């Protein structure tokens, strides 16, 4: 079975730093590398930023717009021009491509999530390279991926990829920003993301983009939890992909974690946007983390947010630290009435016989 790679390239790598417009030499190099990977038998998904930056250039705007509606309109201008550039370059090398525009809502609904998976599989069967971007024009702010680093990790989980490459404007992860701190040291391999808790990764992206190094660490967490090996490397040297796959130690490698959950639980963990938070006592936390138990009403100390039954919620300890996520069996108003109660009291309080569990273990995944 062919291995699947997801390659994410950011705006900072796609555009020229010194004058408006696309960095065509970088894009052409990336296209050539992807075509080589296809000839080697890999399935490749390209997650490409750049629509807003290209739209700004086309409209003569000097800075990225701050208003959401304006940014969405400019993305619509830029997306077509960006895809035309890709299509021209890939066509020259005889490689068909497809445009796939996603919103968080597409992944939050289980049936649409499955439909997206099936579409990607059909594209792979047809020998097509899907080019993915967030559908900025219609995305609702509350349901935005926020950055294409997160989108690429979710796509890697969705398509069950073996590799995720995050192409950026630095050659690897450092202990601090090397452009500001001369004492910053390179990090070549990360076995566990907890090793990086002291790293000052920074949160700001480039002038045109939204993804800083912090978002790449978030993406690496999502991907490695789905058993996807993740690599951060220099976007202006796309030939690094071939070298990395040949075994060269280039960039920063994040080792995949052993897969402990199924595809549905990965969807619960990362595809859904939590709409509420349940604060649990120590006994409930212990039962869930160590015992693999379902959450009962007796263990709930407090409830935050307004949510419906079957929405995703965060399960947290009393300090607010998330320990798990899951699908809740009651809405927030019902939970306010039954929190702290024994399961056999639920029917007396609510007046009907509901589920014994608040979050069943089959619908719960540890964070």
Curated annotation (Swiss-Prot):
Positions of ATP binding: 8, 168-169, 210-216
Keywords: Amino-acid biosynthesis, ATP-binding, Cytoplasm, Kinase, Nucleotide-binding, Proline biosynthesis, Transferase
Any one GO CC term of the record: cytosol
GO molecular function, one term: ATP binding
SMART domains listed in its UniProt record: PUA
Coiled coil segments of this chain: none
SUPFAM superfamilies: Carbamate kinase-like, PUA domain-like
Residues given in the record as substrate binding sites: 49, 136, 148
Catalytic activity, EC: 2.7.2.11
One of the Pfam families matching this protein, by short name: PUA
Claim: Amino-acid biosynthesis is one of the keywords in the record: yes
Reported function: Catalyzes the transfer of a phosphate group to glutamate to form L-glutamate 5-phosphate.
Identification of the protein by name: Glutamate 5-kinase
Organism the protein comes from: Synechococcus elongatus (strain ATCC 33912 / PCC 7942 / FACHB-805)
